């Protein structure tokens, strides 16, 4: 049976942080807050057609999510960043939605992890 991978590799994240669940919880909580703000800003940047603002947001999400082992979100943000570099408005809209969908999964995973930990 195929199992869907978690949006966050908690084992790798815990290993990187010496198994300290309090640090992981703190980092993920801050990330979830920033992600909510960044996603709202990214939606506004799409509406405004502001490719540079959207690229900066995608770049920030790409790096932070990679550091926190949320690799599918990081990949989606990387694709959005590339679309912004190409200034392809329709592709930016699509990639922003893909990134938002991945971010929703990450936020749900963080909330579930908080409840279970």
Identify the role of each PLM range.
Residues 1-117:
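Two-component system phosphorelay core
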């Amino acid at each position: 049976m195929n199992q869907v991978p978690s949006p966050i590799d908690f084992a790798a994240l815990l290993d990187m942080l010496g198994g300290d669940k309090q640090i992981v919880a703190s980092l993920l909580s801050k990330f979830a807050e920033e992600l909510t703000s960044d996603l709202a800003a990214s939606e506004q940047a799409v509406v405004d057609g502001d490719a540079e603002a959207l690229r900066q947001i995608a770049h920030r999400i790409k790096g932070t999510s990679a550091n926190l082992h949320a690799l599918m979100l990081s990949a989606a943000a990387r694709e959005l960043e590339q679309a912004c570099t190409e200034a392809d408005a329709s592709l930016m809209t699509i990639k922003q939605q893909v990134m938002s969908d991945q971010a929703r999964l990450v936020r749900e995973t963080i909330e579930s992890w908080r409840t279970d930990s």
